[in-house]
Regions:
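Short amphipathic, positively biased membrane-proximal segments
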Residues: 1-165
Length: 165
């Protein structure tokens, strides 16, 4: 991200986003005070769900509708639209880590407000994160297998070239 003085924003725009996040977090903490705490065993699934949700929002085509008012997408990449708060939100929507913080807040709020719905959403998103991990591992495995196959074929190709010469 560029420094504030190199963007069409002001520090107040980022302060507004921080104040909103802080207010939502404080409201969540206040609402949670009389509720049963989320069990420690749910931290890993919530983390995986947060990863999947933030990746979905920031990177996937299916969520273009959500980014479109704030982010200009082209073949050259993405850049925030507009100026001031709109631009700042566009920057946020281009940052997986930033969206992850908001996603975590939303998922924990959902889990505290409606435990069954929250656990269901967390399970679906955590399974999606596991799928991403498996897909990445499979792609890496295929890439390495193909590289090994090519490396093994090179000496034979060299030997065949020598025999032909």
């Amino acid at each position: 991200m560029k420094p504030v003085d190199q963007t069409p924003t002001e520090a107040a725009d980022y302060a507004a986003l921080s104040a909103l996040y802080g207010s939502l977090l404080a409201g969540l903490a206040y609402a949670a005070r009389d509720r049963e705490p989320i069990p420690n065993g749910e931290l890993l699934p919530l983390s995986a769900a947060t990863f999947a949700l933030s990746k979905l929002i920031v990177h996937e085509k299916v969520e273009t509708w959500l980014r479109q008012p704030f982010v200009e997408e082209s073949a050259d990449g993405r850049r925030p639209r507009g100026r001031r708060l709109r631009y700042a939100v566009g920057e946020l929507l281009g940052c997986t880590r930033c969206v992850g913080a908001w996603s975590a807040l939303a998922l924990v709020a959902l889990r505290l407000h409606s435990p069954t719905v929250g656990r269901t959403a967390t399970t679906v998103l955590a399974a999606s994160a596991a799928n991403d991990a498996f897909q990445s591992a499979f792609s890496l495995l295929c890439e390495r297998a193909n590289a090994a196959k090519e490396a093994a074929a090179q000496p034979r190709d060299l030997a065949a070239a020598r025999q032909a010469a």
